[in-house]
From Swiss-Prot:
Residues 1-23 form the signal peptide. Keywords: Crown gall tumor, Plasmid, Signal. It comes from the Bacteria. The keyword Signal applies. Belongs to the virb5 family. GO terms for biological process: protein secretion by the type IV secretion system. GO terms for cellular component: type IV secretion system complex. VirB proteins are suggested to act at the bacterial surface and there play an important role in directing T-DNA transfer to plant cells. This is Protein virB5.
Length: 220
């Protein structure tokens, strides 16, 4: 029914574009009419295929819920934000990080240099833990989406739907590989962060020793 309606529309447009007749009788050319009809049928078929593809991508029976979660948020800080989030942090950057820093067992009292250093170290570690926690949550969602995609692929009704669904599945696998590399990089950065904390504590102790030495007149 859809094809016949599309053919009728295409034929109407074709007839309107011919222009006014110059004679009082209709001149019929079977070859031209057959070619026009074939073109109209091909145009209608292509249009219906396009409509079907669009409907498949947006309807429930196509790729349910996959397009909305296809491009998931990147949980990792950009290169320019590494210092402010992990190594010289000013504030917690996620809900998990805020929960860690506000725990009463980690409360630091005082406004001296050592207290400021401890607060910065706690915030940096909390931000790292928050990034890892958000990544785990994203991976859980991706695993669920992959399972749904596999199920959708097995229920595909035609080759077009199967091709689109398979493409989405491949993209999710590719994204998971990228996240795995990012997780490895995060592990490397948190190891460096722990080493930096030790160096910062040693530097703070050295400053205190130097201040004490100045008081007693024994500057190294």
């Amino acid at each position: 029914m859809k094809i016949m309606q599309l053919v009728a529309a295409a034929m109407a447009v074709s007839l309107l574009s011919v222009g006014p007749a110059r004679a009082q009788f209709v001149v019929s050319d079977p070859a031209t009419e057959a070619e026009t009809l074939a073109t109209a049928l091909e145009t209608a078929a292509n249009l219906e295929q396009t409509i079907t593809m669009v409907a498949m991508l947006t309807s429930a029976y196509g790729v349910t819920g996959l397009l909305t979660s296809l491009n998931q948020k990147n949980q990792y800080p950009s290169t320019r934000d590494l210092d402010t989030e992990m190594f010289s942090p000013r504030m917690p950057m996620s809900t998990t990080a805020r929960a860690i820093t506000t725990d009463t067992d980690r409360a630091v009292v005082g406004g001296d240099a050592e207290a400021d250093l401890l607060r910065s170290q706690i915030t940096g570690s909390a931000n790292s833990a928050g990034i890892a926690a958000d990544n785990l949550e994203t991976m859980d969602k991706r695993l669920t989406a992959n399972a749904e995609t596999s199920t959708q692929l097995s229920r595909s009704r035609n080759i077009m739907q199967a091709t689109v669904t398979n493409g989405l599945l491949l993209k999710q696998i590719h994204d998971a590989m990228i996240q795995n590399v990012q997780a490895t990089s995060l592990l490397t950065m948190t190891t460096a962060q722990a080493g930096l904390h030790e160096a910062e504590e040693a530097a703070a102790q050295r400053k205190e020793h130097q201040k004490t030495a100045v008081i007693f007149g024994a500057v190294p």
